[in-house]
Amino acid sequence: MEIATLVAIFISGLLVSFTGYALYTAFGQPSQQLRDPFEEHGD
């Protein structure tokens, strides 16, 4: 394989991994610890 193909696959893998981690943090188990600024405002 050419070096450009390997670099493209590596960058794509990083992007998919980061997106998966962001979704897990936003909607998975760690999301229970996130604060909600709209709940704190309380009008």
From Swiss-Prot:
One of its GO terms (biological process) is photosynthesis. GO terms for cellular component: chloroplast thylakoid membrane. The chain crosses the membrane at residues 3-23. Keywords: Chloroplast, Membrane, Plastid, Thylakoid, Transmembrane, Transmembrane helix. The keyword Transmembrane helix applies. Pfam families: PsbN. It is a single-pass membrane protein. InterPro entries: PSII_PsbN. Coiled coil: none annotated. It is found in: Plastid, Chloroplast thylakoid membrane. Belongs to the PsbN family. May play a role in photosystem I and II biogenesis. This is Protein PsbN. It comes from Euonymus alatus (Burning bush).
